[in-house]
């Protein structure tokens, strides 16, 4: 099989696919505290176009599965309210 044909077919199969990521959603560089409320986090995550979410009990913060690739998630560092 010709390698260029193989590459063309692989490119067509992956065209239009969205990559998704998991993480703590943020607003103003601060994650959302949840108080152990899974329903709140699931709703919050779905509003941000994620597949689902839950309250991660260790950090008591909402964690989302399947966020769009362009969604902001918590990185390293401190929360800076008001900063986008």
Swiss-Prot record:
Expressed by the venom gland. The modification Proline amide is found at residue 81. It is found in: Secreted. Residues 21-80 form the LCN-type CS-alpha/beta domain. Residues 1-19 form the signal peptide. GO terms for biological process: defense response. Disulfide bonds join 30-79, 34-55, 41-62, 45-64. Gene3D superfamilies: Knottin, scorpion toxin-like. It comes from the Eukaryota. One of its GO terms (cellular component) is extracellular region. CDD domains: neurotoxins_LC_scorpion (cd23106). Its main location: secreted. One of its GO terms (molecular function) is sodium channel inhibitor activity. Keywords: Amidation, Disulfide bond, Ion channel impairing toxin, Neurotoxin, Secreted, Signal, Toxin, Voltage-gated sodium channel impairing toxin. Alpha toxins bind voltage-independently at site-3 of sodium channels (Nav) and inhibit the inactivation of the activated channels, thereby blocking neuronal transmission. Has the structural arrangement of an alpha-helix connected to antiparallel beta-sheets by disulfide bonds (CS-alpha/beta). Belongs to the long (4 C-C) scorpion toxin superfamily. Sodium channel inhibitor family. Alpha subfamily. This is Toxin To10.
């Amino acid at each position: 099989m010709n390698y260029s044909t193989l590459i063309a077919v692989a490119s067509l199969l992956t065209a239009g696919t969205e990559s998704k990521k998991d993480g703590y959603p943020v607003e103003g560089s601060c994650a959302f505290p949840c108080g152990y409320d899974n329903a709140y986090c699931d709703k919050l995550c779905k509003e941000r176009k994620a597949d689902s979410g839950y309250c991660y009990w260790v950090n008591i913060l909402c964690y989302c599965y399947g966020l769009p690739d362009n969604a902001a998630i918590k990185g390293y560092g401190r929360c800076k309210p008001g900063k986008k």
